[in-house]
């Protein structure tokens, strides 16, 4: 088995690798969508609207846009020099994680999920 990152954690990997995918492990930033109430809702809406599985980075992009939009709304402007100080105070219950920043702008609580291919499917390891 191989340990990989989020780019390996796809249905396409299992499709291409076939039975050889069994036992491979992949890490993904954030929480598994199915483990977060808003994540499940996002996945359902995405599939209904686009008639396909969620793209690899779509959930992270969605969270990033929501955080920046919230900061712009609170700042009352889109001017970066006025949005940035507000951004550091944002607390957002996202679909991939609870998002908050420290004084240097880093995530306060980075999260990682680990999956393993079992019976031809990615399964979240506890």
Task: State each model region's role.
Residues 1-126:
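Extracytosolic ligand-binding ectodomains
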